[in-house]
């Protein structure tokens, strides 16, 4: 699995700026999705052939006793304890603060690899920046400027050397004994363990535990209606006899790693609770990772008609950027709706892995343009000439033509909908890339 880098520090030291720089290659993929919060806490970065996950923990108040700061501190502690490397960020301009000492005291006790990073160090001599922070007892400080990028590449390379040293060998995704890899994600108490047992069935468990990382990610192979699946542990599910129980609280790190490792993600929601920012953040990460997705709204049997309409409206309003995914209203406890849910898992996987022939893609593109042409931008109208497939899981469609930088986001979404309809691409994100001719005088007007 991809290693996890946790960014920790008191408020306003530049964690979000560093987060954005470390994940910059992925920003464009989600920035234009309507309804998706921009306040992202999880992202992916890559240095060469080494991908990694980043968690921005928010402002860390390690001694907070109550309220929102207490909850943030609890979540931060859990992320730190499960991360492969912790990047502890301090402010080089303002110098050492009492809060930095409290955080350092806590971090030293965790046993995690700690990288002490002095941010906002642009234009300052290293000795002047670093001297204050040696007393934290976390080794040599690394001076960076997250805003300008100074020192960031060297820092993340060092962190990845440590993170990858502890990573087990990657599993073979082409292993024929493995089926579609499914991650079931969601907040605590939404019914993940109940759904797992409904899927696997107590009387016909074909399951075994395989240690993944040192923090015991578990893969459970099972069959359903003659098809093979592999369930990735997301909720600290552990087998008790023939059933699975959730014995750990919600883990951001395990959730991110499971999403990244999956072929299809089931986002499980509680019909009796409003959709939270946490749900939206996790859903956004699924889209960013390009994973096929099915939404399960659990405990549906406990709602009257009015409550059901309210829950559907909440889903449409808060997760409208997931309109490509099928939603199923289920009861894991009563095992209702499970069959339809799994059929959507199969369909989403098939869509994510679909092979799209160039002639058919180009024909679909031409028909879409004939039905609705892109708007002009000044004297220039984009000319869309042909399309081919650039990748799978998620499907990537590459469109060639002239002046394609003038294509609007609205028109891009129109094309996406046309391609989805033509090729039945339900349940998977779809990427569209434009490649323009290098001739600046081509096809003006």
Curated annotation (Swiss-Prot):
Domain of life: Bacteria
Keyword set, alphabetical order: GTP-binding, Nucleotide-binding, Repeat, Ribosome biogenesis
Segments crossing the lipid bilayer: none
Cited Pfam families: KH_dom-like, MMR_HSR1
Matching InterPro entries: AAA+_ATPase (IPR003593), G_ENGA (IPR031166), GTP-bd (IPR006073), GTPase_Der (IPR016484), KH_dom-like (IPR032859), KH_dom-like_a/b (IPR015946), P-loop_NTPase (IPR027417), Small_GTP-bd (IPR005225)
Keyword Acetylation part of the UniProt annotation: no
Disulfide bridges in this chain: none
Coiled coil regions in record: none
Residue ranges of domain EngA-type G in the record: 3-167, 180-353
GO terms assigned for molecular function: ATP hydrolysis activity; GTP binding; ribosome binding
SUPFAM superfamilies reported in the protein's UniProt record: P-loop containing nucleoside triphosphate hydrolases
Subunit structure: Associates with the 50S ribosomal subunit.
Function: GTPase that plays an essential role in the late steps of ribosome biogenesis.
Family label: Belongs to the TRAFAC class TrmE-Era-EngA-EngB-Septin-like GTPase superfamily. EngA (Der) GTPase family.
Identification of the protein by name: GTPase Der
UniProt source species: Burkholderia multivorans (strain ATCC 17616 / 249)
